Amino acid sequence: MIPTRKISFLQRALLSTAACLVFSACQASSEAAPSADTPQAAPQIAQQTAALQSSDNIDFSNYLTRVPEDDVVYFMLPDRFENGDPTNDTGGFPGGKLDHGFDPTHKGFYHGGDLKGLTSRLDYIKGMGASAIWLGPIYKNKPVQGGPGQESSGYHGYWINDFTSVDPHLGTNAELKTFVDAAHSRGMKVYLDIITNHTADVISYRECYDPDYKGADKVTEGCKYRSLADYPYTTRGDVNGPTINAGFMGDEDHHQTAENFAKLTQHDYAYTPYIPAGEEDAKTPAWLNDIKYYHNRGETTWEGESSLYGDFAGLDDLNTEHPEVVDGMIDIFKGWITDYKMDGFRIDTTRHVNPNFWKQFLPAMKKHAAKEGIPNFYMFGEVYDPDPAALARFTRVDGFDQVLDFGFQAAVFDVVSGKTGTDRFDRFLDADSLYGEATKNGRTLPTFLGNHDMGRFSGMVKNENPEMSQEELLARTQLAHGLMMFMRGVPVIYSGSEQGFVSDGNDQSAREDMFPSRTAVYNDNDLIGTDATTAESNFDVDHPLYRYIADTSAIRRAHPALSRGEMIHRLTEKDGSLFAFSRIDPKTGHEYLITANIGTAPRAVNVAIDAGSSDLETLMGTCGTMKTTGVVSLELPPFGLSVCRSATPSTRFGK
């Protein structure tokens, strides 16, 4: 049972405004306002809009035939979501926290969330309209890494030492199967977070870490990256060293053959790699324990060549140019498709992997998924860059159908935080053609507002506007979610966003627990839309953000134009707050006009639409009147959002 939360009068007003926006214009009422202690039922949007649904309704019961752009995705790190089995909190490892990695008071250690807990909350996730789950990495990790005083754990899932097993802190392989089957039984998809760039930190370099090393080239200040030019594969130590690996032709695309890599037999071209005693068999599958499958060039600088060949914070960087690594990774992740019937992959550190790897790996995954009866297998890469031109390289050249849309995140943050006018959207959306037809010009890109790396959207807006009230921060955060639901792309909700979480930083600081937290640096955060803290269980289906997401996702689900339709710019303002765009139903030709006021004052506006569109029907907010052919007049409250549908198909777009 979820306790009723006390919220302020202004927060109740915002919630009421959201409900009014969903149904139609708010009208005066003589009824007394409900007390703060009275739980309010969430608006039933599907019922309200049933008469206005497109004739091309989507069958949401069949997750296999549903195309990815029709989904709303919910993302979580399992360790931070729900603890369904406290007996696995230490993963079965003996010793203290530096052995098993469990310390729920420390933001950098395991907290106890697991697959049983996640399975128990599937109806909560589905209730907000999510139809797909992006599951953070669940593989067995090295429990603890880091030097003395800098230790943290692999709770996040990205320090893998067994690519075939579920991390025992999270549960078992059987419990993963139970979770996926339970999601599928609800018509929900599961996208698994995968890593091909690196493994856990096992390999060391004698020049840096071996206390018995006496060589003149002993390193005292970290293992700095050593480049291909200064430390080629064919000499030992540096370019002036003795010849090794005779006949090896390098690792460019046309030399990535088994015959060529068979000549790469000595691996001390840059550093002298070794596996510390006791860790010789630390990784699974067994082939990952062979030093020859890693670059062994030292720490990345995150720039240039080192971003492909360097170790991230000591993590062992896989030689993804090596054909046996390519084949090995293909075999590993085919297994996750076969055994668990995953519906797609989110692919970590995409830009740090050899591009030719993707041209082999991605088609192999699609082909295997189709063979397993998964025709709409959805893969999206992580390329941490807000520049659409940089992102589009991966769809145009490297073979990705989708990449996470960091450009969308940057544009929405700039506008909704007040940094720029709405003309920022012009510059962003004009780049959609760069992505190509594979993404349907951006319509299949996963869009998001914040995540576990960069931090939460609400926290970023607060940092940009330190004096902003909690009520205004809630209104801006709601509006940002509304824009994400109705603009092109596949919306991704980061767990906790729907409960008003406001991180006070990025990475570890933005990975709060949904179940009652014992982490002081989380529990002192001031959440929006509630008086609760992260010290409580935060699965409140009456939270204004949960309700807003549920309401807007219901509208999106009822009208395929809002997921599949072409997006047309209608209005932006330089240094202004108004933004309008249309989505066109690809089957019926109906035009949907979405208008937002991203400002603190009411606005009245005339918006030009297609001359064939007429008699706008209200799906959300107030839709005003047709002033004349092709012009609609609207009034929007502060942070207001309206969604309007033409009653008749446009003559221009009708089929």
Task: State the predicted function of each range.
Residues 55-56, 180, 184, 198, ...:
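Active-site-proximal helices and loops of the catalytic beta/alpha 8
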Residues 130, 342, 400, 489-490:
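A structural motif
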Residues 442-470:
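Active-site clefts of carbohydrate-active enzymes
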Residues 76, 125, 135, 163, ...:
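Conserved, mostly hydrophobic/aromatic
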Residues 73-75, 132, 189-191, 344-346, ...:
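Structural preference for beta-strand elements that scaffold enzyme active sites
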Residues 65-71, 79-332, 339-340, 361-365, ...:
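Substrate-binding/active-site clefts of carbohydrate-active enzymes
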Residues 80, 134-147, 193-203, 349-356, ...:
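Short, solvent-exposed turn/loop segments enriched in Gly/Ser/Thr/Pro and often Arg
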Residues 2-6, 11-18, 24-75, 83, ...:
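Carbohydrate-interacting/catalytic domains
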